[in-house]
Amino acid sequence: MAGKSGEEKMKAMEAEMALFEQEVLGAPVALPPVDPVPLPIPAVPVIRAIIATNTYSQVQQSLEARAAAAASVVGPMIVPPVPFVGPAIPPPRPPVMRPSFIPHALQRPAEPHGAMPRPSFIPHVLQQRAVGPRHPGMPPPQPLMAHHMHGPPPPLMRHIPPPPLGMRAGPPPAPVGPLPPPPRPVVPSAPKMNPTVIQAAPTVYTAPPVRKPEEEIVEPPILPDEKETLSFEEAVIGPSMPEMEPVQPEVVLEPVQEDKKKTKPEKLKRCIRTAAGTSWEDQSLLEWESDDFRIFCGDLGNEVNDDILARAFSRYPSFLRAKVIRDKRTGKTKGYGFVSFKDPNDYVRAMREMNGKYVGSRPIKLRKSQWKDRNMDVVRKKQREKKKLGLR
């Protein structure tokens, strides 16, 4: 009894889904011929049988078996999709303005069979699985057995209804709208100019290399001709070469003689002085000019240095140098120094004006310097002159 009630339940569900599809598409509802089945009033045992544990699994297995059979039969019959050719698509139907949600009871028109009740609730899982491709040979669905529910029927859940059975076999309809314009062919114009530029470059660079080899070819024959002419001239003017050879050594010998002349005065610059029966070489005399006029400055204080002494005699235009003599070991002044002039007139004026003047903290004492009398060479010359005169 439970198996029969489950099959009847499935048939009723399929019939309900077919009616729902027809109502959505706006087609007239045609009820399939149904054998008169006595509808017992007490439907309680049927409901109790559906609620059993095995009813759901049996219904699910039967739905899967039917879906597999329908797929295996309808699969080969599907026509391959035809590519879209052009404006062969019929114009779409004007959309029917319907509200977003209409109660199920109001969607159905008045049926002549008023005594046949409809189920008030269909599970969501059964709605999705019951809707599927139907084979033409399948029997029409049977209406669902009526049973009473407490309260008004709840509204159906929103879902997109499947397309009608006649349109499932064909390809999906193409979107209706303005066709996109065909792509325009791209005409490459810029690359045509590049070959002309590349061809022009070789013509510019090939011209100079053609001229250079010609010049190089012309130059080599000139060089051997010059060598031949030079060799010929050398053969003719052979005696002139020995004359050029002695000229070079003469130029080299001249600087050698100059060097000898320069070295001689260096030897004469040695200043050997004599005093108290002893002689020594005084290198300090090389700092002074040999033809100047020097003044001996005595009685100088310890605070007097070269700058103070030079400041005292710098007012004379021919003033050359002033120096204070100091001890080499201690660096203390010895109390005297020397001042030199280039002009003898300034020398005489300084002797008159500066003698006895204060330079520092003491009056200065001036007299003629006798450094030449202490020179060895000068002393020997004087001795020779005296011998010639017969004085000593």
From Swiss-Prot:
Residues 293-371 form the RRM domain. The keyword Cytoplasm applies. Pfam families: RRM_1. Residues 381-392 have a biased composition (Basic residues). It is found in: Nucleus; Cytoplasm. Its main location: nucleus. SUPFAM superfamilies: RNA-binding domain, RBD. Residues 372-392 are annotated as: Disordered. The keyword Cytoplasm applies. It comes from the Eukaryota. Keywords: Cytoplasm, Nucleus, RNA-binding. GO terms for molecular function: mRNA binding. InterPro entries: Nucleotide-bd_a/b_plait_sf, RBD_domain_sf, RBM42_RBP45_47-like, RBM42_RRM, RRM_dom. GO terms for cellular component: cytoplasm; nucleus. May bind RNA. Belongs to the RRM RBM42 family. This is RNA-binding protein 42. The lineage of its organism: Eukaryota, Metazoa, Chordata, Craniata, Vertebrata. The gene is rbm42.
